[in-house]
Amino acid sequence: MNNYNKAPSQNTESTGWESVAAMADEFKGEKEKRIEIGNLSPEDNFEQVAEALFLVDQYIFPDLFGDEEGAKKYSKELFSDDPEALFSFDKTLVAKDENGDIAGILVYRGDKCTPWDTNSIREKYLAIGNDLPERFERANENYLKKITGPELPKDAVEIEFLGVRDGYRGRGIGSSLMQSLINNPAVSEVHLDVLDSHPGARKLYDKFGFLPEGDKFPNYPDGTEGVQHMVYKNPHYVDKKNEEVE
């Protein structure tokens, strides 16, 4: 996860979505109900997906969508069948409750990521009748294009967006989404960034076995806060290509 898409506002009561930091307290909540983890599909409730995307990040999605109504109208167009795209159905995990409602979402990218195409996104946006938000170009060029740029090690992934809806906190949902990803034997490493202002998130990542890598760098856009890159190396990783050769 790059330094432009760090965290939602920490005022979770006003956003309806917790910051990633709040996940450290998830196991203290109400009695667990049935939650299933799987990939996002075109049949899912994209108004709930839009709520997730619009509120999980305080920089990117208000710039991209303009407002929450824009997010509800447009979010489905953002997702792609291309398994190597950012916002791929293949690389978006959702947690659903017993009614099929989306409780949480985790968006990640792989080691090979299709370059972000601002023109394609612009055309899709205009085709469904939305005016371009004032900072649409900034969201695409300064945020999303840069997220898809850095290369990752073979079979590694990077978590870009993670959130749990209000009403589902305290049930370990964020942790379950994370566990589902790091337990995947096809994933060699999981990368993410954590803000200094989120010690709870850092504690959670430490618990999962993430280790800091490299020096801290400034947070976008004001540079007043440190960001630490962290990596989890999957001990259960199986390199299928090497397995086939043997």
Role assignments for model-derived ranges:
Residues R34-E51, Y59-L64, G110-D111:
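A short beta-loop-alpha structural element at the N-terminal edge
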Residues S188-R202, F208, G214-E246:
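C-terminal "cap" of GNAT-fold acetyltransferases
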Residues K112-V157:
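Conserved acyl-donor/pantetheine-binding loop and adjacent beta-alpha core of acyl/acetyltransferases
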Residues V94, D101-G110, E158, G163:
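Conserved beta-strand in the GNAT
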Residues Q58-F79, P115, L126-N130:
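Conserved GNAT-fold acetyl-CoA-binding loop/helix
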Residues K6-F46, Y237-E246:
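Conserved N-terminal entry element of GNAT/NAT acetyltransferase domains
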Residues G170-N183, K203-K207:
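Conserved acetyl-CoA-binding loop-helix of GNAT-fold acetyltransferases
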Residues E69-T92, D97-E98, K146-T148:
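Active-site rim helix/loop that mediates acceptor-substrate recognition in acyltransferases
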